[in-house]
Amino acid sequence: MKNLSALTFLMIMTTLLSGCKSKQAESNPLLETWSTPFGVPPFDKIKTEHFKPAVEAGIRLHEAQIDSIVKNTETPSFGNVIEALDRSGEVLNNAYTVFSLLNSAESNDRMQADDMEISPLVSAHNDNIYLNDRLFQKVKAVYDQREYLSLDPQQLRLTEQTYKRFVRAGALLTPAQKEQLKKINEQLSRLGVQFGNNLLADNNAFTLVIDKQEDLAGVPASIQSAASTEAVNRKMEGKWVFTLSKPSMIPFLSYSERRDLREKLYKAYLERCNRGDSTDNKQIVNEIAKLRLEKARLMGYPSYGAFALDDEMAQTPENAYALLDKLWQPSLELAKKELEEMKAIKKAETGDDSFESWDWWYYAEKVRKQKYDLNEEMLRPYLSLDNVVQGIFQLSNRLWGITFRPVSVPVYHKECIAYEVLDKDNKHLGILYFDFFPRPGKQGGAWCGAYREERYEEGKR
């Protein structure tokens, strides 16, 4: 009777746990079919706490799909190996892609902490796939027979690219080398996340706060207005705040007559993650460089540059340096000429031609105004954001026949806007999100990413 009770209890608990998992999947939008317009991510339903469970569930599902490919007893073919691999992992890919891009565009402390676990987890999962010898032997079997399988050009390229990915991921290494590579990849994943978190923290930590109108001498009214708005957003009404984001920093460096303030802002930017504090990245950079070299040598390359470029257009570091060398001398000569022009203006104004890095933007603007009578502020009304966007749309239409129309879909931030992109026949091509402005949780720079890439299955897009 005791055994029966224990067995009954175990069955009940298993049922309850299964129900809990099922309920979790049902309540996690990243694990559901995206029934949104055009299948875009349901940003209005996604919460930070959804990401880690979704990635973990995606990994389990992907593992089962890989296991099915490995255990398939049929002769390896394009369909049951290469195509099956290409179709696998969709749930994981969707969840991790949304997480990665949102962590770059709308990050927070919870997401950054989760990333320290999620990215190494995904890195280890990828290693478990690409370093799986049984799986690789199936890929290799198809690759070796590719010329005799009547593959079309797309199938042939996918086969070759799949094989190359396995090889570049370490599939040809010995078992001991594979274990070493796994450890390196895990460390690199963690260090990469920490580097990015530190940089974002330092970008957000510094502000140049100005509380006197006279300290804004030379700064155009439009730039002052933006700095005033930034101050209001930070609950510092009546002041002006400049940050290390390029749209805030570069205009100040270009127009401010206060050399000491230009120096302060410029040095703050230059010294990010380099002050010996908790966000200092020097040791992280050293460790990344050492691990990359170790990985490259493990893979049979003399340097990480040689490994990274082997699959790129340049092919070798020597080719890359040869191109840079061609550009270096003429670029240097032009820079010297521009420097002399700027120093001449500085000497005429101040009697001193000594020059520092934080003077460059300021005097470059003066040279431009003197030589070409060009004042960028006068162009501002013609180059408003709306005008520039419409100009891009019109040019794209003239070149490729594509059109853009505003569309109402879920977005991840109130400043984000979306457009449906249509081809010359007015057929749907995709959804384009615009997110123009810097903010504390957003990675700096001009960058873009894809939430869902185009794919065809059985001839259907």
Question: Model-found features: residue ranges?
Answer:
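Bacterial N-terminal signal peptides that target proteins for export
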Residues: 1-8
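Polybasic, lysine/arginine-rich low-complexity segments
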Residues: 2, 21-23
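Repetitive helical segments and hydrophobic/amphipathic motifs
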Residues: 11-12
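C-terminal motif of bacterial Sec signal peptides marking the signal peptidase cleavage site
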Residues: 16-19
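N-terminal helix-rich structural modules
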Residues: 24-219
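Short His/Asp/Glu-rich catalytic/ion-coordination signatures at enzyme active sites or charged loops
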Residues: 35-50, 99-118, 141-183, 243-283, ...
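Hydrophobic residues within well-ordered, non-membrane alpha-helices that form the packing/core
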Residues: 55, 59, 66, 126, ...
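Active-site-proximal, well-structured secondary-structure segments within enzyme catalytic domains
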Residues: 158, 190, 197, 201-243, ...
